[in-house]
Amino acid sequence: MTEATTIPSVTLSNGVVMPAIGFGVFQIPDDAMDATVRHALAAGYRAFDTAPMYGNERSLGRPLTDSGVPRQELFVTTKVSNEDQGYQSTRDAVEKSVARLGLDYVDLCLIHWPAPARGTYLDTWRALEALHARGLGPAVGGSNFQPD
């Protein structure tokens, strides 16, 4: 095993501190997740990035909760898929993601793609703010937004 490395952190605009480098689990199959996460934790990773469309939230949550690393030392990000955008569907989708992960909350929940043609990303954002206020996510944001 590699000796764990201390990863620098960044402070978000709302004061939430997150590791500057995270471990993405896109395309990691369920049968490889336990060993992969164990090695990532041993190497010092504490931030993990997933999404419902990756199909592996449940298999990521298991090794994280079984790792013995205190929850407050982990930083878990998930995302809202395009088909889940809209106020109520976003709320439902995030609650399902948290349940699949086997956690009480996610540290960061992102709008995976803005999909402006759908006209729902503002309602999606409002839902993320409401979930944040309920404690299901200390931080919210967007990914893959374009400059225009």
Predicted regions and their residues:
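Residue-level detector of alpha-helix boundaries and kinks
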Residues: 8, 45-46, 79-82, 113, ...
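N-terminal binding-site loop/beta-alpha segment at the start of enzyme catalytic domains
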Residues: 1-74, 127, 133
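Glycine/proline-rich, positively charged
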Residues: 85-148
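Charge-rich, low-complexity amphipathic helices
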Residues: 45, 62-63, 70, 82, ...
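Hydrophobic faces of well-ordered beta-strands that scaffold small-molecule active sites
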Residues: 19-24, 48, 74-78, 106-111, ...
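Active-site mouth loops of central-metabolism enzymes
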Residues: 19-31, 78-88, 113-119
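Short beta->alpha linker loops
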Residues: 52-55, 82, 144-145
